[in-house]
Amino acid sequence: MKNAKISRRSFLKAGAVASAVGMLSAAPVAAHAAETDASAAADEENGLLDVFKKPKYVFLFIGDGMGTAQIQSARFYKGTVDNNGAVTEADLSFTSFPQVGSVTTYDSTSFCPDSASTATSIATGHKTESGVINMCPWTRDVPYETIAEKLHAQKGYKVGVISTVNIDHATPAAFYAHQKTRKNYYEIGVELANSGFEYFAGGEFQKVNGDGTGPDNHTVAANAGYNVVTTQAGAAALTAGAGKTLIIAENLGDGKAMNYAMDAANGEWQLTDYVKKGIELLNNKKGFFMMTESGKIDWACHANDAAASIHDVLEMSNAVQAAVDFYNAHPNETLILVTADHETGGMAIGYKTTNYDTFLTNLTHQKMSYAKFDSTYVQGYIANKTPFEAAMADVKTHFGLTLPTDPDAASAGKLLLTDYEVANLRTAYERTLEVG
């Protein structure tokens, strides 16, 4: 497919598409852009943004699965916790951006799309089928060129792709790969190496060894001229001029992705650190494009883990702040877009069973994600046939939920389980031990 020349109109259209994406109906959009003096004056007069300078530095942040409820739950949680339980809404780094909106996110065949098709829409402006990455939905043999590829080839921009999940996962892959199915993980990794993009950072390749007959994805990248860095110390030591770089996070959690923000150890690099390193490595006179995905918001919501979702949204806010800091140093040359590819889980903030209350401060008692609890404790319970009461002692430690028979029951407050809840938990636990 021939490269279409980037005009000012098409670039801004691509920017609008990049801000437009969510799983059931709409996703939030926020943008912070370079303005000319004329547009600033127009803004002041009539509230409209009429004229942009062409952005030299473009940041695109995608909260995978991050609908309005995910954003608001993080704002409410932070506001409540920071104000001793008072009903207070906190600002995030991107919630006060001057341009805000929402968009529908259906793909070519479904109102409930996945990350492959929605990320394709963001990256190329084309709709396709769920599961397909940057290929036409009818024959799956016509590739779509991505905005990252256009900027890299036609404008000489350096390009960075960052994700808290696997670097070959659907969303990051949609900026450099073209595959009939998102499950072609090894082939996606090969396309990463062939992209020539200057900076990649995230979790491990999902099928790093392919079918075992060829070089692993690390070797493929190294053979293509990439510095393949797998330690945090090695990443920290990188400086401008390091050349093409692929960083695989040293500390990996479930699914060989980066750890949830709430599970990260003290000093462990999180999304913000990789954004800052990306800025350091990509910054140049021609410009750069950086796509950053907070991918485990989606994973948390698939697991109905509200606390993990909240903490990953807050960490994404920190990462966006790093871009805002860069914007403040380059206000007339920088565009920041913050959006989602789709919403996940149909999150609601309060409902009938909670009497439309939220109990957000209860989440402060959760000390680890559901996924980490499962891998750290539940697998051992299954192997050892741990008694229910012993397992619930760990639940109390890491989530605060307390049995009525516990010595601390009188002081457990709203975290005291009812007999009905205990019966349901016991049944579910026994079923877990039975089926593994």
Predicted regions and their residues:
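C-terminal segment of N-terminal export signals and the immediately downstream linker at the start
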Residues: 26-56
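Alpha/propeptide regions of enzymes that mature by internal proteolysis
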Residues: 47-48, 62, 68, 72, ...
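Active-site-adjacent structural elements in enzyme catalytic domains
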Residues: 53-70, 75, 139-154
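Structural beta-sheet core signal
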Residues: 60-61, 161, 338
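A glycine- and small-residue-enriched flexible loop/hinge segment at structural boundaries
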Residues: 110, 114-138
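Extracytoplasmic mature domains of secreted/periplasmic and thylakoid-lumen proteins
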Residues: 127-190
